[in-house]
Every structure is written in C-alpha cells, then in structure tokens.
C-alpha cells in the first residue's frame, strides 16, 4: 500500500495530519511522497498524531509505509 492509499484508508487527509502535527501540509507531502525521509522522532510524532486522529496504527506500520514510499521514489 502506498502512502496516499494508507492515509485514505484511515480516512485522514494530509491537511488533517499536518494540523495535528503542527506543521505544513507540504512537510507531510514531502514525507509521504518519499522525497525526504522523516527522522525517527518524526515517525513517532506521525504515529502518535495518526492515532490521535483515530487511525489505530503502530510505529512499524507507519515506518514501513514511509520507507516503501522512499524506496519507490529512489527507484529501488
């Protein structure tokens, strides 16, 4: 599952996640498109924010989606 589908499957938009994180939608887009990988701390923050929005996800799930996005972006 790609990052866009992951968020959609949870019923959460990038804008909602950005608001919960206190960052811009652009930051979220960069992370979820694989253009730039978030730090470990930010993956934790993303996981926490998603759960606060009702997504019921684990750190490992979020890390995997973000990692796959990064690998797809790099062409691996």
Predicted regions and their residues:
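Short, basic-rich loop-to-helix N-cap that marks the start of a DNA-contacting helix
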Residues: 35-48
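Recognition helix of helix-turn-helix/homeodomain-like DNA-binding domains
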Residues: 23-38
